[in-house]
Amino acid sequence: MNRTDELRTARIESLVTPAELALRYPVTPGVATHVTDSRRRIEKILNGEDKRLLVIIGPCSIHDLTAAMEYATRLQSLRNQYQSRLEIVMRTYFEKPRTVVGWKGLISDPDLNGSYRVNHGLELARKLLLQVNELGVPTATEFLDMVTGQFIADLISWGAIGARTTESQIHREMASALSCPVGFKNGTDGNTRIAVDAIRAARASHMFLSPDKNGQMTIYQTSGNPYGHIIMRGGKKPNYHADDIAAACDTLHEFDLPEHLVVDFSHGNCQKQHRRQLEVCEDICQQIRNGSTAIAGIMAESFLREGTQKIVGSQPLTYGQSITDPCLGWEDTERLVEKLASAVDTRF
């Protein structure tokens, strides 16, 4: 009889279960308290109960655990310095959606060479998240599919659904199940209505199929996530200006949703020129000084060293520099955070 299935499958490998990985890298009571408390603080900011600003900042993607931990240690110092004005959360992105092809992140390809040692990548991701949380720094990530989140979601304080997946039904269903607040990016064309629709969908109860912590396919029914919000990330043109934010708030108001959102300084808002994140910051700071309460948070891409680099065979990489989108360097990061804290002073 002719085979009719898996005709284009080149390789099958068994995967560690989320439960097995959690046994190897368990959540300590201290980390559990830290994650729970940071989620509650973020929820209060998104609801307008806390006047502070949520600042989600870090590398475009994680590829080097040593550099990531050095960044986290520096970020913890900034958290301590500005905690009365800012809730600083580290961007820890392990999966990268690609427009066509390219490196898909630490979980998929931890060795950066196409060997796809996914089990090792999952170990590295969970290990790093534990270490960063143990420092006292909350973590943020993008949830790209229905499987990998099961391995790390218990260590995440804030999650994102990306511009390419906000319109996806399964991602909206997943967001309705996540235990952390979730931001939905506007579409790559700049359309914010799809993000508002996603927020509405994620607040509802859903049923979907997914592996559970033991790897068993399971029917999940969710209770809905009340902490969905828009991430203004720009599109064909930037959408961080006051009139753009007002228009987004009008749409939120139309559906009786909280009129609080997050502005992404990077991506479409900087038109892929990383130093323009500083210009976006200046504009957002002025809006805050002018009395805007809609801006609950910001996102920015920064690392130890400015710019980006390409992976070229076995050539050594520059330490602390992105291998995906270009990032601001550390000195600019300090300046950006200081400006945000100064602007937020006017809310108190």
Curated annotation (Swiss-Prot):
Listed GO CC annotations: cytoplasm
Family: Belongs to the class-I DAHP synthase family.
PANTHER family cross-referenced by the UniProt entry: PHOSPHO-2-DEHYDRO-3-DEOXYHEPTONATE ALDOLASE DAHP SYNTHETASE, PHOSPHO-2-DEHYDRO-3-DEOXYHEPTONATE ALDOLASE, TRP-SENSITIVE
NCBIfam families (UniProt xref): aroFGH, PRK12755.1, PRK12756.1
UniProt-listed Enzyme Commission number(s): 2.5.1.54
SUPFAM superfamilies per record: Aldolase (SSF51569)
EC category name: transferase
Other known facts: There are 3 DAHP synthases, AroH is feedback-inhibited by Trp. The other 2 DAHP synthases are Tyr- and Phe-sensitive, respectively.
GO biological process terms held by the UniProt record: amino acid biosynthetic process; aromatic amino acid family biosynthetic process; chorismate biosynthetic process
Any one Pfam family match given in the protein's UniProt record, by short name: DAHP_synth_1
Pathway assigned in UniProt: Metabolic intermediate biosynthesis; chorismate biosynthesis; chorismate from D-erythrose 4-phosphate and phosphoenolpyruvate: step 1/7
Function, in words: Stereospecific condensation of phosphoenolpyruvate (PEP) and D-erythrose-4-phosphate (E4P) giving rise to 3-deoxy-D-arabino-heptulosonate-7-phosphate (DAHP).
Gene Ontology molecular functions: 3-deoxy-7-phosphoheptulonate synthase activity; identical protein binding
Protein name in UniProt: Phospho-2-dehydro-3-deoxyheptonate aldolase, Trp-sensitive
Reactions performed catalytically: D-erythrose 4-phosphate + phosphoenolpyruvate + H2O = 7-phospho-2-dehydro-3-deoxy-D-arabino-heptonate + phosphate
Keywords, sorted A to Z: Amino-acid biosynthesis, Aromatic amino acid biosynthesis, Transferase
